Each structure stands twice: as C-alpha cells, then as structure tokens.
Amino acid sequence: VAEAGLDDQIEVDSCGVGDWHVGQLPDSRMRRHGAHRGYRVDHHARQFSAADFDRFDYIIVMDEGNYRAISAKARTQAQADRILRMSDYLDADCGYDSVPDPYYGGDRDFELALDLIEQGCRHLLSQLQRQL
C-alpha cells in the first residue's frame, strides 16, 4: 500500500476471530519470517469486533473457519457482502483454496502463508487501485 502511494487512502489492520491471543505479540516465527521479508510484525493481537464492519470497507479472511465466524457477526446482508476470502485473490493455479494456518507447522508453513498472503494482497491492491 505504501509502495503504491496509497497509505493515505487505504488502512490495513489485522485481528483474530477468537480471544486466545488478545494483547500478545504475533507468533515469534511469524515475526521472524516477516522481518526477513521487510515487514514490521509488532502489533498486539486483538479480536474481531462487530464495530469493525463500521470501520472497514472490506473484511478479508484467510479460511472458511474465519469466514463462518466473521459472517456470524454480520448484522446486515450489506456487512456480510463485505466479507471476502483471501483465496478469491490467489492465482487460480496456485493450488490453494485458503491460506493455511502455519501455527502448528514449521518454517515452510510460515513461508507458504506469507507467499499466499503477498500474492493475494497484490491482486487485491490492483482491484482497489481500479476502484479509487
């Protein structure tokens, strides 16, 4: 977003569907792998809130479990329509229909998750640029 010069128009945030890690830093492995790619991964976890529907134009989820959990919090069809899957922005031939949770895996799993997130974000950003 910043590289595209759109950080004054696009706000990006991250949160979890559950309260398991609220207030904690991200997994140390994700921080390490993210840092190797030049990302600052130093935010503290927060749980998704229905108020996020008022704050954000789009809610992007990583997998079907996230989709169901967030959809259950939508108060209107308009809110539900703004919940999108990251997999909708992945290359059709990438072989994944969601972003696998790397938490129980190893280094390769964290790299894969970041690869898929980067790929999806590139396509999502292209779409947003056409809309702005």
Predicted regions, residues:
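Conserved active-site segments centered on acidic
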Residues: V1-F56, S126-L132
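Small/polar loops that bind or transfer phosphate-bearing groups
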Residues: S14, V61-M62
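A short linear-motif detector with a strong N-terminal bias
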Residues: G38-R40, M62-G65
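Phosphate-binding/catalytic loops
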Residues: Y58, E64-L132
